[in-house]
Amino acid sequence: MEEFFQQLTNGLAVGGIYALIALGYTMVYGVLKLINFAHGDLFTIGAFLGLTLLTSLGLTDAIGPVAGLILLAVMVVILVGVVGFLLERIAYRPLRTSPRLSAVVSALGASIFFQNAIMLIWGARPLVYPHGLLPNITVSILGVELPLIRILMFAISVVLMCALYYLTHKTRIGTAIRAAAIDQGAAKLMGIDVNRVISLVFMIGPALGGAAGVMVGLYYGQISFTMGWLYGLKAFTAAILGGIGNIPGAMLGGLLLGVVESLGAAYISIAWKDAISFLVLILILIVRPTGLLGERVADKV
């Protein structure tokens, strides 16, 4: 039972990361009906920016580990949000009225550009986050000792997801985002600046991905310029699992995928960890193509 609880909490922590990245996919798809294939690379940029700021500014030494890491995360969120904004303005907006394939090619090109830019700036070898930034202590929950960083990762993910849900469902900005996702033409007639909404979506999604990148660096300790490919693919799987375009669905899909992956690695084989994730994707596409929380689509005859 203790082993099961350990794997469950590990799955929730990793699933929170998948969920944060998946939210970027699902927000862009909800508004533009477009898959941002460069989103995983924005997550990678967040991880590398976090390492650079951490080592160059010495925030944890100046203001303490907890306050330093919080300030670091805020800085990364802002910087990656700006990169996402520029990506939309340069790679997507000029092609908005072009055939859908043009935007897909542009997204793939942006992904290749980001990977090579990361490699040129930080090098091709994996980099390591500093050790010992947080106290190496455990917290006892239901008689099971859990690492503090695992609990913090899950808590931060939940806070960010709740903040996004509040933004999209309880504010005027969120109402504008949801209106643009339903019908851009009608949203324009209602006085909503759709271009501004799309830019905002491209800032929020990558910002969450950047925060996830920092958490991955702190949790696993090592980052590489290709890490966004696998994490992006799994987050895309999570978005489809929950229902692409559905924000609560992306949250649920990420957490479920993390738990299934963690339990599968523990009780089946760690060699099958990635395969289990994509097997879940295949099964959900067969059983419920619109995802767990996606709306069923039916043609009236």
Please report, for each region that a protein language model flagged, where it lies by residue.
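Membrane-embedded helix boundary and interhelical linker motif in transport proteins
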Residues: V31-L86, I90
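Short loop segments and helix-boundary regions at transmembrane helix junctions
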Residues: G30-A38, V82-R125, L167-G174, A179, ...
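Membrane-interfacial amphipathic/re-entrant helices at transmembrane-helix boundaries
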Residues: M1-I21, L49, T60-L71, S98-A103, ...
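Inter-helical junctions in multi-pass inner-membrane proteins, predominant
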Residues: E2-I17, L167-T168, R172, I198-A239, ...
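Transmembrane helix-bundle core of multi-pass membrane transporters
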Residues: P94-L95, R100-K170, V197, G221, ...
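Short, non-helical or kinked segments that cap or interrupt transmembrane helices
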Residues: Y25-F48, T97-S102, I173-A176, V194, ...
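Hydrophobic alpha-helical segments within and immediately flanking transmembrane helices
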Residues: V14-Y25, A38-L59, L87, V105-S106, ...
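Helix-loop-helix "hairpin" substructures at the membrane interface of multi-pass membrane proteins
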Residues: V14, E145-I223, I247-G253
